[in-house]
Amino acid sequence: MNTASDQTHAISVNQLRSFIERIERLEEEKKAIADDIKDVYTELKGSGFDSKAVRKIVGLRKQEDHKRMEEEAVIQLYKNALGMT
């Protein structure tokens, strides 16, 4: 005999299983995308580009313009203070 509590428990278990399966599927997709990105960096390095510099540029492009400009200004200030310009 199923009680309301048993049905609620079954629904909760099914919902939990669904969440976990979605997370696992997304983790697989994330790994595949990371592998694809790694392949692109390998390809660009093979074409003579500096992968470290490209990674830096990719990171800079993710930033908002004003944040990037602020960071660059602070770095330039510190470089000037250390006589690096």
Curated annotation (Swiss-Prot):
Matching InterPro entries: GapR-like (IPR018753), GapR-like_DNA-bd (IPR046367)
Domain of life: Bacteria
Pfam families: GapR_DNA-bd (PF10073)
GO MF entries: DNA binding
Family that this chain belongs to: Belongs to the UPF0335 family.
Identification of the protein by name: UPF0335 protein BARBAKC583_0130
Organism, scientific name: Bartonella bacilliformis (strain ATCC 35685 / KC583 / Herrer 020/F12,63)
